[in-house]
Amino acid sequence: NIILAANQAKAMVKDKDIIVIPTKTVPQGITAVINYVPDLSAAENEETMNAEIGNVRTGQVTYAVRDTTIDDKEIKQGDYMGLGDHGILSVGTEMDTVAFEMIENMMDDSLELISIYYGSDVDEQTAQALRDKVEAAYPSCDVELQYGGQPIYYYIVSGE
């Protein structure tokens, strides 16, 4: 557990004040960094960052390395999977369909911003097509698209 390791490292350092922000996903980490304000105290930044990471939902599209059943979903080796904060949100053989269904399952009326980070195995045109589909389906949300370049995860998506 990386958070446990960070807290152990914090306990070992005696000559510095260290605060661990317990993010569990890349989008939570990005949100924490965006909400850092240099003019605020460490305690104020910690409070703000912790509050904001609680508002982030994360989805990640990857592929199955073997046949399995998870969350009552039958998954075949090579299938695309949309993983959410609390389990599998979508499964299928078409990456973009799985990504869109994952986003649909992440959504509710409280979300205002959807950020899509596409990985090294997704071309820009494919990612833009997903963004366009999400924008059309959720016109009340701002939809951002960024090249993340990450391996393994075709898409990392945050909803805030």
What residue spans do the PLM features occupy?
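N-terminal loops that bind phosphate or other acidic moieties
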Residues: 1-160
